[in-house]
Amino acid sequence: MEEFQGYLDXNRSRQHYLLYPLLFREYIYALAHDHGLNRSILFENAGYDNKXSSIIVKRLITRMYQQNSLIFSAKDSIQNQFFGHNKNLYSQILSEGFAVIVEIPFSLRFLFSLERKEIAKSHNLRSIHSIFPFLZDXFTHLDYVSDVLIPYHIHLEILVQTLRYWVKDASSLHLLRFFLHDYWNSFITPKKHITFFLKGNPRLFLFLYNSHICEYEYIFLFLRNQSSHLRSTSSGIFFERIHFYVKIEHFHFVKVFFDNNFQCILWFLKDPFMHYVRYQGKFFMASKDTPLLMNKWKCYLVNLWQYHFSVWFQPGRIDINQLCKYSLDFLGYRSSVRLNSSVVRSQMLENLFLINNAMKKFETIVPIIPLIGSLYKSNFCNTFGHPISKPSRTDSSDSDIIDRFLRICRNLSHYHSGSSKKKSLYRVKYILRLSCVKTLARKHKRTVRTFVKRLGSEFFEEFLTEEEVVFSLIFPRTYSTSRRLYRGQIWYLDITSINDLVNYE
């Protein structure tokens, strides 16, 4: 095991990057500003000539290292002469600087891995829709699935220790530890099962959270690649700055028990049909045949989180379900595997046979209730899904109102083009279309019926998507044929982000 540990340390970071001096370079904060977390916060302090100065950073670091300034009560922090109401401003500046410099080792390693694997031009691999054809090909042959929420209660020291494997600059890590202990409670707010980051400071803490997940998956991939008993192929590792996506096919199982000193005993059990996919704050894994290997994999995960990452996790929170009786809420879709039965009549001489064929089909539908909830929060409809007008848009011109509704409708249709059943999508388009009409009627102080007659049928044709227009041109007379083709699943490889209305979790 010492040999494995040495290999992990050697491959995490091959170079020592001196990052601490970069905190005092003003171009680092200009770079962070251009990345667009909060584009105005660095220029709202008129006392420093409208620019982020290295003097601010030096003074903040000096105060952080002083024992008296590390403890603030709720009243004293408001009246503090140095921090005062600008405490959030200074912490925002420093957090943006940290976020840029700690990403440097990861970015260099990412570019190196792309050059080594020669997949730099494979931009389609970063598409969200690219995962669904993979699931469609693989999940129809699987039997059991587990949908697991990744534990989020991560201790600060665990985060810093994780970065120690990648960043070898002791000064930066020491300052980061001071910074996190001082500002942790003001930056994140636990809510239900997910850690929500405050809008003013998401970048650094999202990076820390994803680096923790990356460390867990790095051990996972290391054990798979280094063991001769685990011969498998990986379909791709997507290493992004904010979100990391990993999809692995033909994964073989490893059972590992960790203790505090990272000593372990390995049992290798071959399972050529284990699949693992992570998305947002969850992951799911699926396997074929009996649930025995799923239970062993669950045991591995629980021990990994509890003994290596010091995160308490109850095994009972990982349920093993039959794939044919379970639906996955995944990236705006509700995915499931359904059995389609067909009876074939066969006759040989005087004997008649009825053959019942059961075929598995991967279905993806649009969950209408959560999507209507998102439309309700955006004031497009009420809680029952009835369209309403948007008073905030009545000050805009008619063309701007129509263009905005058309853009939202087409983006949703484009994202949900892979749905097996379009009925829910048609209902969403109806809500947006009628909400647009009601907004225009409210602006001109007319009834909806009068305004619809004024717009005519051409207005409703504008809400047709590109696919519907193309099919109507190819099959102008055979409406049933075009409708049957449009009902099929269409996956686009240019979708790299989730629509705000789709991301309702």
UniProtKB/Swiss-Prot annotation:
Which HAMAP family does this chain map to? MatK
User: Cellular location of this protein?
Assistant: Plastid, Chloroplast
- Identify its protein family: Belongs to the intron maturase 2 family. MatK subfamily.
Q: Which Pfam families match?
A: Intron_maturas2, MatK_N
Gene Ontology molecular-function annotations: RNA binding
Which is one Gene Ontology cellular component term of this protein?
Answer: chloroplast
Name of protein: Maturase K
Q: Which domain of life is it from?
A: Eukaryota
The gene coding this protein? matK
- What keywords would UniProt list here? Chloroplast, mRNA processing, Plastid, RNA-binding, tRNA processing
Protein's job: Usually encoded in the trnK tRNA gene intron. Probably assists in splicing its own and other chloroplast group II introns.
Species for this entry: Kunzea ericoides (White teatree)
GO terms classed as biological process: mRNA processing; RNA splicing; tRNA processing
